[in-house]
């Protein structure tokens, strides 16, 4: 009896962890291919992540505006915000990766440009997410749908703030480190 209970618990635990570990990839196959092509170029990689992240916000606006998508709209917005947040995390990971890596003079220059573009993009993203939150709080229909995505919206706003702060901090470090340009 005890062995059967232990086996049942073990199976339940294995099934639960396998489902918990499955997250859908926010990138399409084509987007993943584009990223692979520029894997060693910090600037192009950051530009692509910004483009893909912006596309999630554009899709979110389309879902909100399309009356045909009214059914399940809150869940669709939730999923797009989740994808957006995952992509913002990828931007953070790339910032960390390239900040800690010795870069050639040209790559460091490109990284600086990428940092500036991340800051500008984060300001845009922040404004768009703030607008979504305002609509979700003030529009009666959207308020009902917002129950499905308000928590994820807050996560997205936190992620944007984190990315913007990180890019600003790294930009200051890169500007103050002239020796980094002389290393290669």
Question: In which residue ranges do the predicted regions lie?
Answer:
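Long, charged/polar, soluble alpha-helical segments
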Residues: 21-184
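Sec-dependent signal peptide recognition
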Residues: 2-10
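Hydrophobic h-region of N-terminal signal peptides that target proteins for export
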Residues: 11-20
């Amino acid at each position: 009896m005890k062995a059967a209970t232990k086996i049942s618990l073990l199976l339940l635990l294995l099934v639960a962890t396998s489902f918990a570990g499955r997250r859908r990839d926010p990138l399409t196959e084509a987007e993943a291919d584009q990223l692979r092509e520029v894997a060693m170029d910090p600037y192009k990689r950051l530009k692509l992540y910004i483009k893909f992240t912006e596309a999630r916000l554009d899709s979110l606006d389309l879902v909100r505006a399309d009356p045909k998508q009214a059914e399940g709209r809150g869940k669709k917005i939730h999923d797009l915000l989740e994808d957006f947040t995952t992509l913002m995390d990828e931007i953070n990971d790339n910032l960390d990766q390239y900040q800690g890596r010795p870069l050639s003079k040209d790559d460091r220059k490109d990284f600086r440009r990428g940092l500036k573009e991340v800051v500008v993009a984060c300001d845009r993203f922040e404004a768009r997410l703030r607008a979504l939150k305002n609509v979700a709080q003030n529009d009666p229909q959207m308020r009902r749908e917002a129950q499905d995505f308000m928590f994820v919206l807050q996560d997205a706003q936190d992620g944007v703030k984190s990315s913007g702060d990180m890019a600003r901090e790294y930009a200051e470090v890169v500007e103050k480190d002239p020796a980094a340009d002389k290393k290669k």
